[in-house]
Structures are given as structure tokens and as C-alpha cells.
Amino acid sequence: YEMFLDYSDNHPAACLNYDPSHFLLQQLDYLDFIRLYSERIKGVHVKDAEFRPTGRVGVYGGYQSWSGRAGRFRSLGDGQVDFTRVFTLLTEAGYNSWAVLEWECCVKSPEQGAAEGAPFIAKHIIETADVAFDDFAGGGTDQTQNRQILGLS
């Protein structure tokens, strides 16, 4: 990606649609990529995958059956992508755009994947806090109320 940015002179339109499943299948750190390039992420595909190498099949395992591949796409939550961390890092980076279900799975039916997909994404969307939990500490206190709560008055 850095070569692309170099060749485009870091053009502001040189942005991307982030898809953690492809990073996982390439054995790249999909979480670190968010940290490195969050300002370039303008869309997100919510898609899961798993990488299961064996003594016979790996990254360059040749053509295998859909379910026999070392790297394969899975329904959301059935693969190895840590979506809690993905959504947390995106939220912390200020991402506020689309999170689109992209589905392929070599095990489940499309109907089951679709039925599970929207609730899965909704469960991972993070509403950002408007205040810190300890913001109250900078405010004043009501001594009378505190004494009543403690049973001292």
C-alpha cells in the first residue's frame, strides 16, 4: 500500500475499502493495518475467514475444493477475524462510515449467513461515549446529599 501511496504522491483520493478477511488469508496483521492507515479507510467489508494450513496445503497449496483450501471464507463469527478489536480500533480512529456485510462461506448456506450477518454487525457497532466515566470528578459536590447517602444526617 505504501508503494501505491508513493506512486500517487499521497493523493487524498488514494483511499481504500478495508476487508480484514483478505488480510487474514494473506497472513498480514489486519489490526496493525488499521493503526497504520486508519485515515485512508473509507469503507469496511465485514467478512470473516480462517487459515488452516496442513502438511499438504498452505498459502500456495494449489487448487483445492472450496472447503479443502487452507484459506477459506467463513460466515461472520465462524472464522478467525477478531471483530471486537476491528470495530474498537476503527471507532478509536474516528471511523464513521459504512460497515457492509460481504458474505462467502464454504460451510453455511447463504440464507443462514444473511440471517446471522446483520445481527452480528449490529452487535459489534460501537456507540462512542460523549464523556469520560470520570468527568464528574471535575464538578462540584453536594455535601448535604452526600451526608444523606452515607446516613450521616
Write out the residue ranges for each language-model feature.
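Terminal-tail/helix-coil boundary detector
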Residues: 126-153
